[in-house]
Structures are given as C-alpha cells and as structure tokens.
Amino acid sequence: MDQLTSAARLMIVSDLDHTMVDHHDPENLSLLRFNALWEANYRENSLLVFSTGRSPTLYKELRKEKPMLTPDITIMSVGTEITYGNSMEPDDGWEAFLNDKWDRKIVTEETSKFPELTLQSETEQRPHKVSFYVQKDKAQDITGTLSKRLEERGLDVKIIYSGGMDLDILPQGAGKGRALAYLLKKLKSEGKLPNNTLACGDSGNDAELFSIPDVYGVMVANAQEELLQWRAANAKDSPKVIHATERCAAGIIQAIGHFNLGPNTSPRDVTDMSDCKMENFVPAYEVVKFYLFFEKWRRGEIENSDLHLSNLKAVCRPSGTFVHPSGVEKYLEDCINTLRTCHGDKQGKQFRIWVDLVLPTQVGSDSWLVSFKKWELCGEERQCCITTVLLSSKNVTVADGLTWTHVHQTWLQGAAASDSASWFF
C-alpha cells in the first residue's frame, strides 16, 4: 500500500476460503492463475485486500498451506481487525471505533444461556468477536432471541450466520462491509480512492460487501445458498453484482473481464509466451513470464530444445551475472546452459513456482530494478528467496522484451532450500 502515491487503479477485496482459495483444487491452479495475473498487471498500481472470517492465527496457517500472495491490507475476524502490509500493522482507529456499545463480558454471559451454541476454538475468539457453531435449523430462532437479550443489556451488536454452521457476534459497527466502507472513506480522505473496487465472496458473512455503494461484486460459482438467497432478495437486478460461472479465483478473474476492470488474461493461460504482445515495457510481466517458463521447463511441459534456451539467452546480457542465495556468483548464460540437467526433473510432481510482491522501480532512463519474493513448492516443501533483478531496455524493442543484466537472491529467513545445489535462478 505504501508504494501508491495516487489512487489505486483497482482494489480487489476478497474472501479467502472457497473464494480466493479453492479447497477442492489440490493443484491450486485457479489461485496460481490469479497470482500470475495480479503480479504481472496489477501489483504496482492496485490494492489487494483479503477479507476473511479467520482469526490472525488461522489466517497465518492458511498462508503456510496455500500459495497465497501478500495482500496490501488484511481484514480478519469477520471485519473486526484491519492490518496493513506484510508486517500486519493494526489500524488503531478501527479498534477504537468498535468499542462503542460493546462489552465482551456481557456477550459471554448471555450466550452461555443457550446450550445449542458450541463455542469455537480459542484462536477464533477475538476482542471484538465471539464465535460459535450452531445447527442450521436452530440458527434463526437463536439469532432473534439473542439479539433481543443483548439489546436489553445495552449493547448494539450484529449476529452473522454463515457457512451453514458458523455464528459470529460482533459490534454493530463491525463486519466485512463496514470494514470496507471504513477503508474507502480513509483512502478518500487521503486522496487515494480507488478508481474501481471489486468485492468477491461465497458465503453469508460476505453479503455486506455487496451492499457498499459504487462497488462491483462477484459471487463465485460455488457460492453458498445463504448468499444466493441474499442476492435474490437484495441485488438480483443489480448490474454491478454477478454470480460467476467459474469457481473461486477463476470467478474473480471472470469478473475482472465482465466489468472491464483491466487485463483479465493470466500469463498462466498463455500457451506460447513469445506470442505476448505488449505496447510498452512491463518489468513485472517480464519477471512473471520468466519464472513461468522455468516452472514449465522443470515440469517437462515444454520441449527440451535449443530454440528455447537460445530465446532465454537472447533476453540475458552476455556479461550478465546471477548471485545464488549461497553467495556463489555465475554468468547468466552459464546458468542457462545448466538448465539442460534439470529439464523435466519435476515431471509428475506437485511442483509450482510463483512470485509475490513484484515491485519495479525505474532507476534510469532505460533500466528498472525489480524486487520480489520467488517461491518454489514441491510436494509439501516450499522454499523462498528475496530476489532483485536489474532489467534494461537499452538497444531492444518492446517486442524483444527487456534484457536481464543482473539477478541477486538471498534466502528468506526460515525458507531456505535444504539442498542449495537444486536451486536454479
């Protein structure tokens, strides 16, 4: 978020479970497709917001399980916690706002009188959220009775039922929709109101997102019954809210195209990357394209041919260098020559590469320094290195692509490869 000095071109606000993340997609293909699209075309001038019912603890667990990008803003615990950046700095103003007519002790006292409510795990109990499980056929009656009792005790709360079993009690000012409205107001006060905002969800606790004025919305194909019922009652004829035909992250990509919010072809959907025609030099796209080629090479999905290696050498300066995370420095061309040895070595394995936080900085009239995290996943093992790449447009055309002149990598703390010799680029 700090990299933006003006309004974001697009702000995507997405739920995680069964929206951005498809738990029925073991290869995480739709998520990886979105990742490549975002890093290649949007990261530099847009905002990615994850809005989840998960607590910080469970959110961090999900990030370890799935190949997720780092969001600019994270809204957690059903809109009761807002944090910023990779360091997840809390929004103190939002916390203070939620304290109005909220008393967690009273909520606990009143809910203890309902044996039908089963308290969720301790990690899901937050300062401004008390969470339970409840049977579907009991939810409506309990919600009505409990709301009345809490109001009589002087509280102003909202009770959200979602997922066919989850019941969350929050301050009235909380919730995913209120958190989004707060963010939009804050960005507007800073002169950075996004040009377009797209809200994405699949369950009842996402409904509020679709009621915020001037926000586009997509309910993914696998949206739950309670959200579709809300749409039928509140937004059936709205041209700004669609029910996608694609699941999860694929549905988000579909919505970007439907509303004409920007590029909607993921680099992962381009069969021949040499066919990509760009109007200008786009350093982030070059980085994404390079590592997608490397993934396909190691998975044996592209032919082991001299032509591919020649094309790779053509975008590298002959004197260009690569500093391996171990500290060893080599010429880029020598590194490319060694790729013969690893062609198809990950064939049949769950091997994926993705890049995160791709941020280009123009450091000269014809050069860019691009920083990012490069991740590799093979089975259950994942490694990551902090990478900086120096790219040049000197003596090349847009059709040729940028020239790689230097690559430098260092291991991300706690994510180093057990065998450094197996790490290429």
From Swiss-Prot:
Catalyzes the final step of sucrose synthesis. It comes from Nicotiana tabacum. PANTHER family: SUCROSE-PHOSPHATASE 2-RELATED. GO terms for molecular function: magnesium ion binding; sucrose-phosphate phosphatase activity. Pathway: Glycan biosynthesis; sucrose biosynthesis; sucrose from D-fructose 6-phosphate and UDP-alpha-D-glucose: step 2/2. Gene3D superfamilies: 3.10.450.50, 3.90.1070.10, HAD superfamily/HAD-like. This is Sucrose-phosphatase 1. Pfam families: S6PP (PF05116), S6PP_C (PF08472). Coiled coil: none annotated.
